[in-house]
């Protein structure tokens, strides 16, 4: 895995390329992200770089969290902490700033976010189940149907697709194209939609697998 950056989803808009085609993009405020911890094989058993994003008042954080930020030499505590696994983390030091200069236009990236919560949803909306007959005599219109056999096994298997809370899950969208990078404003424009609400936290990293871009 390569080092990425943390950002905040601002919303969607569209821009026009040189040929006049409209490109839908998501605007992300990315970084600057201070390095809060560098993990190594000797001390942690694996190599990774932990980044921080956003600011928070000390009163809303625990004392260990405040001490963790002060140990990294940060002027103010950060609200979010995320780490990126790397094969070699020796080139990074606590307090170092990671900015959107990490990316370039045309690059493919993977974006991780938390999907929008939809609340309690039924089988058709949550799992795309088919409906039952809509005839006058039918009583099975949107019901999920059988959820298992009888005495054997005598239980519902774990993971059975059923109605329940929908959304609010970690979602990864792969191989999206960076359309534009604006370093002076800490903004990156990524083609297409990204998971989560406006203001939601995103993790942006170089694409693990390269090939034809989505969109």
Swiss-Prot record:
The membrane-spanning stretches of this chain are none
Per UniProt, the keywords (alphabetical) are:
Ribonucleoprotein, Ribosomal protein, RNA-binding, rRNA-binding
* One Gene Ontology term of the molecular function aspect: structural constituent of ribosome
Q: What InterPro entries does this protein's entry cite?
A: Ribosomal_uL3, Ribosomal_uL3_bac/org-type, Ribosomal_uL3_CS, Transl_B-barrel_sf
What SUPFAM superfamilies does the record tag this protein with? Answer: Translation proteins
GO CC terms, sorted:
cytosolic large ribosomal subunit
Annotated region Disordered: where? 134-166
Q: Could you give a single Gene Ontology term from the biological process aspect? A: translation
Show the Pfam families listed in the entry.
Answer: Ribosomal_L3
Binding partners and assembly: Part of the 50S ribosomal subunit. Forms a cluster with proteins L14 and L19.
PANTHER family in alphabetical order: 50S RIBOSOMAL PROTEIN L3, LARGE RIBOSOMAL SUBUNIT PROTEIN UL3C
Q: Which family does it belong to?
A: Belongs to the universal ribosomal protein uL3 family.
Protein task: One of the primary rRNA binding proteins, it binds directly near the 3'-end of the 23S rRNA, where it nucleates assembly of the 50S subunit.
What's the protein name? Large ribosomal subunit protein uL3
Record lineage: Bacteria, Bacillati, Cyanobacteriota, Cyanophyceae, Gloeobacterales
| Record gene name | rplC
């Amino acid at each position: 895995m390569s080092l990425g950056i943390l950002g905040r989803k601002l919303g969607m808009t569209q821009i026009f390329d040189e040929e006049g085609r409209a490109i839908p993009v998501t605007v992300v405020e990315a970084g600057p992200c201070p390095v809060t911890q560098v993990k190594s094989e000797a001390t942690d058993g694996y190599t990774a770089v932990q980044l921080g994003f956003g600011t928070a008042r000390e009163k809303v954080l625990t004392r260990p969290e405040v001490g963790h930020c002060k140990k990294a030499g940060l002027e103010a505590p950060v609200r979010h902490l995320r780490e990126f696994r790397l094969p070699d983390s020796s080139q990074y030091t606590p307090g170092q700033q990671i900015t959107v200069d990490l990316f370039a236009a045309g690059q493919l990236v993977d974006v991780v976010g938390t999907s929008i919560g939809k609340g309690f949803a039924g089988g058709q909306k949550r799992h795309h189940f088919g409906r039952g007959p809509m005839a006058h005599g039918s009583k099975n219109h949107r019901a999920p149907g059988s959820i298992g056999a009888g005495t054997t096994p005598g239980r519902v298997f774990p993971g059975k697709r059923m109605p329940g809370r929908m959304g609010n899950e970690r979602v990864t969208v792969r191989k999206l194209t960076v359309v534009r990078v604006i370093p002076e404003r800490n903004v990156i424009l990524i083609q297409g939609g990204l998971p989560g609400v406006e203001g939601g936290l995103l993790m942006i990293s170089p694409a693990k697998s390269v090939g034809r871009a989505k969109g």
